[in-house]
UniProtKB/Swiss-Prot annotation:
Signal peptide coordinates: none
Lineage: Bacteria, Bacillati, Bacillota, Clostridia, Lachnospirales
Protein name: Large ribosomal subunit protein uL14
GO cellular component, one term: cytosolic large ribosomal subunit
Xref: HAMAP family: Ribosomal_uL14 (MF_01367)
GO molecular-function term, one example from the UniProt record: large ribosomal subunit rRNA binding
NCBIfam families: rplN_bact
GO biological process, one term: translation
Organism, scientific name: Lachnospira eligens (strain ATCC 27750 / DSM 3376 / VPI C15-48 / C15-B4)
Pfam families: Ribosomal_L14
Subunit structure: Part of the 50S ribosomal subunit. Forms a cluster with proteins L3 and L19. In the 70S ribosome, L14 and L19 interact and together make contacts with the 16S rRNA in bridges B5 and B8.
UniProt keyword terms in alphabetical order: Ribonucleoprotein, Ribosomal protein, RNA-binding, rRNA-binding
SMART domains: Ribosomal_L14
Amino acid sequence: MVQQETRLKVADNTGAKEILCIRVMGGSTRRYANIGDVIVATVKEATPGGVVKKGDVVKAVVVRSVKGARRKDGSYIKFDENAAVIIKDDQTPKGTRIFGPVARELRDKKFMKIVSLAPEVL
């Protein structure tokens, strides 16, 4: 579960290492984001020479969440960290590689490019 001021690890090669959530997309009163939800974030830590710089405002999709997500069969999928992938306005990833596993819920939310780039889908 991600809300405003939550810091997330970046799971792609855009150059950002850590982002801070500043808004959850999907309505003016929406408070929480889970796996597959889009957030607006600012880059808090970045590597030199990357696509994004520190202070940039970006859109990102949550790919791993400590809170986890409930599946149709009643099971839960949980991760050890909160992580996101930076996306463009057309919902495609800005980077060319995805690091670490991603949840199967991204396929239901139509983030096929992220699912295909990910090394493991849980």
